[in-house]
Regions:
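Glycine-rich loop(s) and the adjacent beta-strand/alpha-helix scaffold that form part
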Residues: 66-69, 73, 80-90, 243, ...
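N-terminal Rossmann-like FAD-binding beta1-loop-alpha1 element of flavoenzymes
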Residues: 49-76
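Redox-cofactor-proximal catalytic regions of oxidoreductases
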Residues: 95-182, 371, 430
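FAD cofactor-binding and catalytic pocket of flavoenzymes
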Residues: 4, 17, 23-29, 107, ...
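Extreme N-terminal leader/targeting segments of oxidoreductases
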Residues: 1-51, 69-70, 550-554
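A conserved FAD-binding loop/helix module that cradles the flavin
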Residues: 527-546
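A glycine-rich dinucleotide-binding beta-alpha-beta segment and adjacent secondary-structure elements
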Residues: 19, 23-24, 48, 215-219, ...
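Conserved redox-cofactor binding core of oxidoreductases
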Residues: 5-28, 111, 146-270, 490, ...
Length: 554
């Protein structure tokens, strides 16, 4: 036992050696220490900083923290505010829409994807401030889907190259869960959380159906971590974690970046990247602060605005040298944008389930993640517990055609329902893309238009996932089931590739066209997988930072 405690202490010291963020919160864990925020380093626009980073979400915050620790002068911009969890977040669905990117956007295509809620974020921490906290890894097979399955695209990096960065981020968040048997089997820094009625229902049904399910992995502290408290299981992870038990860059990487001299400029909308017409190098960013246009000089620029805003920014950065948009000589910017199919199936039970009393995803199976040669579709899906809160639950019920007294009956029955959600690997297609619309936003910038249409393989996957969720719930004793079709998790739009004709960035997240411009967000992912992408985005950004520190010049 003493040896185990010693090993745990050594692992903790290793985390603190590379990321002190959890110890840089106030002692009650409620927010970043005020002296770090109020006394952060402030650069002038005329200071040529080493790097300007656009976006403070999963990718941008990790890059900022790594480079600040390496001694780089770094400024990160975010279009939204620097959140104060206790002040800005509420345990209320309707009162949490300010966490989303609600600026104008257009959607189209055969199967339009709603924007502005679960797949967007605006503010320091990005969409991770309102994500569910679920952080599985991608599988080794995700990196070779074209070679192995004849669909999607191969990554220019391998799973093995990303593994050490997965491990680092899992320790820094930290992640809690059972030993994971799928993909590359591995364990997690913290043990699993207690299981709720929803999770128990999933485990019981999966066992009867012959399906393996496991608890975790969640980026939620199971016990105190630094100044962060234990989860209190209030069930409002998607509305921002008021106690800061759930990890987000706002508390996991930003504090350490500030402590090492980085600046975070909140409420600053970056409008374009400036490129020197003679040298072809990025020299800074144009941005709006309090409605006033400004320009920050920088030796390098990194974009981390995610899969809608990153392509939009590149396209809005057109110039004489790049008339069709920055880095768009081969018409790759905005293409291959993906979502996951995310149908949710609920089952009614005679016992009370109280599905909201836990992190929304807490039990999962990845048994159906890989291509099954006996099935008529390629790739696969995962299944997790989900726990729609009352307003979302009402939307589920109304989607089945229930209104009036019937709707009221389903709402009063809320505590008797359990709910599962699938993540289906929808495939990258070139015509699923972001372009610029004629409409302009309040800054006078063309807004993004996102066109999306499913392929036959996508539809087959969603149908198969629904059937499996129904089987699990019925095996657990559900008396009735209902399913709502939905989407989750945008990725792609500026994908990494081995060749400039097939993508926007190389294996190290440098753009092919501009040698000192990087992209470090979910837009660089060539495929989607059936896993929540946050951990992979952070690991890719950590790897890009590592390569950049080793070799600042290409």
């Amino acid at each position: 036992m003493t040896a185990l405690r010693g090993a745990a202490a050594a692992a903790l010291d290793g985390v603190r050696d590379r990321n002190q963020s959890a110890w840089l919160l106030t002692p009650d864990g409620s927010r970043t220490r005020p002296d770090l925020r109020d006394g952060m380093r402030r650069y002038a626009d005329t200071d040529e900083v080493d790097i300007a980073i656009v976006g403070c979400g999963a990718g941008g915050s990790v890059l900022l923290q790594r480079l600040a620790r390496a001694g780089w002068s770094a400024v990160a911009f975010d279009a939204g505010p620097f959140w104060e969890p206790g002040r800005d977040w509420v345990s209320d669905e309707a009162g949490s829409h300010h966490l989303y990117w609600t600026e104008p956007r257009q959607i189209g295509g055969g199967d339009p994807v709603p924007l502005g809620s679960n797949n967007s974020g605006r503010g320091v921490g990005g969409s991770m401030v309102h994500y569910a906290g679920y952080v599985p890894r991608f599988h080794p097979s995700d990196f070779l889907t074209r070679t192995n399955d004849g669909v999607g695209a191969d990554w220019p990096i391998s799973y093995d190259e990303l593994r050490p960065f997965y491990e680092d981020i899992e320790n820094e968040l930290p992640v809690a869960g059972e030993d994971w048997p799928w993909g590359d089997p591995h364990s997690y820094p913290h043990g699993p959380h207690p299981v709720s009625g929803n999770g128990e229902t999933f485990l019981r049904g999966a066992n009867v159906a012959g399906i393996t399910a496991k608890v975790g992995p969640v980026a939620i502290t199971n016990g105190r971590f630094g100044h962060r408290p234990h989860c209190i299981y209030r069930g409002f992870c998607l509305q921002g974690c008021k106690v800061n038990a759930k990890a987000s860059p706002l508390i996991t990487h930003i504090p350490d970046a500030l402590d090492h001299g980085a600046e975070v400029r909140a409420d600053c909308m970056v409008s374009s990247i400036e490129v020197d017409e003679r040298t072809g190098r990025a020299i800074g960013v144009h941005y709006f602060r309090d409605g006033v246009p400004r320009f920050q000089q920088a030796r390098m620029v990194a974009i981390a605005g995610y899969s809608i805003e990153t392509p939009r920014l590149l396209l809005n950065s057109a110039s004489t040298r790049f008339p069709d948009g920055l880095c768009n000589e081969f018409d790759q910017v905005g293409r291959y944008l993906m979502v996951q199919g995310a149908p949710q199936t609920a089952g009614r039970f005679s016992d009370e389930i109280r599905m909201w009393k836990a992190p929304p995803p807490e039990v999962s199976t990845e048994q159906f993640y890989e291509t099954d040669p006996t099935k008529p579709y390629k790739r696969g899906y995962s299944i997790q517990t989900v726990s729609p809160l009352p307003i979302t639950w009402a939307e589920h019920v109304m989607a089945q055609g229930h209104w009036g007294a019937d709707l009221r009956r389903y709402m009063s029955d809320y505590v008797h329902w359990a709910c599962l959600g699938a993540l289906c690997e929808f495939l990258p297609q070139p015509d699923n893309r972001v372009t610029l619309a004629d409409e302009k936003d309040r800054y006078g910038l063309p807004v993004a238009h996102f066109s999306y249409t499913q392929c036959d393989n996508d539809r087959a996957l969603a149908k198969a996932a629904q059937a499996t969720m129904e089987r699990i719930l019925e095996a657990a004793g559900a008396q009735e089931t209902m399913t709502v079709q939905r989407y989750a998790h945008l990725v792609g739009g500026a994908r990494m590739a081995a060749d400039e004709t097939e993508g926007v960035v190389d294996a190290n997240c440098r753009t092919f066209a501009v040698p000192n411009l990087l992209i470090t967000d979910g837009s660089v992912l060539p495929t989607q997988g059936s896993a929540n992408p946050a951990l992979t985005i952070m690991a890719v950004a950590a790897r890009a930072a590592d390569r950049l520190i080793e070799r600042p010049e290409p």
